[in-house]
Amino acid sequence: MNDANKLPSRPLLAVSLSLALAVGSAHAQAPAPGAPLTIAQIKAMLGEQGYTKVDDLKFDDGLWKAKATSGDGKRGEVRIGAQGGRIYAEGARSKLSEAEVVASLTSQGYSRVHDVKYEDGLWEAKAQTSSGQKQQVYADPTDGRVVSAQND
């Protein structure tokens, strides 16, 4: 039998299988695209971003909300997108103006956009869907996309 047809040694095979299993199990723990995040994943994400003392973690208005201390020692409210996991911190500045947010919501199919305000790191507005349903909408401060929408 030539060298190309030989099986790898048992120790090498064992190491290879162990690595394959480790990579497979790590991949299995990652959330599926579009899947809602768990409390453990939310806490881990906040910790990775330097937040400590995470309290009062709850799901409300289609968003995760918590009180936490940031890496620079400031205590405040954070909101976390339920599916994307993006963190919106109280006191963070918006890259969009109110008019740009209204334009973004309109381009996403909303009409009668009003009561627009920037609060706790997210834009909030009342709007109407194309089917006429009134909703409370939360929009991302960097691109204006809807993070959460709840029937009003």
Tell me the role of every PLM-derived stretch.
Residues 12-22:
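Bacterial N-terminal signal peptides
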Residues 76-87, 135-148:
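A short, surface-exposed beta-strand/turn
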Residues 35-75:
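N-terminal secretory signal peptides
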Residues 64-66, 125-126, 136, 144:
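Conserved histidines in hydrophobic membrane contexts and catalytic metal-binding motifs
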Residues 32-52, 93-112:
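Short, non-transmembrane alpha-helical segments in secretory-pathway proteins
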Residues 2-13:
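Bacterial N-terminal signal peptides that target proteins for export
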Residues 62-65, 86-88, 118-124:
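Surface-exposed aromatic
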Residues 24-28:
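Sec/Tat signal peptide C-region and signal peptidase I cleavage site
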